[in-house]
């Protein structure tokens, strides 16, 4: 009987291409030849091609879930029964079990992770989970030991096949506590940007990366008046003009951004007084222009759920075919619950919840973002 380790390369490649993404690390540790094979471009293309075919056939989304300071890969299929619609693929462990991840951002298959140690010192690491490649970024916290900075990951598209990846980091609390810097992956260097915005991005607002640029919900610098989108253009290395939202939220409303197929933006609004939730999707989104679909994607009365999604922490994604939204939050029976939940809400207002388990910290919320594996090396 032929052992797996003795198979010809083409046959071994065909067999190993069926291995899940989170099992690749074990494959690479099993056999030296498999390690070499699995790190080749030919295998990677076949492997990711097979995974994409399976996902399309099963109507699955591949997502990254940050929960309890760890990063997981999950597959979501809202066409399945509620018990099996969210399937954990496994923990992405290239950073090591001793590393606590407090923030994660996705762009083009790369993850930008902000980590913390026992003394609350923050560190920045760029990570390609597919290759298991990491780069720790040297940085300084000029204003406070705790990391109160806002981060974004994007790229400058030099040609059809060449992309230059960059990291934006800023803090903007006051004229004496303001700093905007950009890090170039290729040159391994930081550069200070001259930015004096007339708007403000609250520190808890998460940006969404789309086509190499990052979008945030922003507001007037003074007071809580008009709300809008702002985009950081990584090619020009500057913020672009304000972009309109399809609706204006009140101060205590929940507002959150998400990407759709890596092509469009979606925004979730939930009114704090009526609990009505609306989701709108763009038909065009560029750094200096946005068009919103004239018809709301989903508008439902959430009184039956009897709570408002977390203003500062909720993350979500939509399934266009089934017209549902999946929101990741906490259980709402208590003021500060220790159970993580995923809420699946349909266009008719019906909803179901998936229990994601007990949380180690009742004040740390689950975070989900889209994920498409990448062959990029840095």
Swiss-Prot record:
Q: Which SMART domains match?
A: FBOX
> Which PROSITE patterns does the record match to this protein?
FBOX (PS50181)
Transmembrane parts of this sequence: none
- The F-box domain extends over 1-47
Q: What is this protein called?
A: Putative F-box protein At3g24580
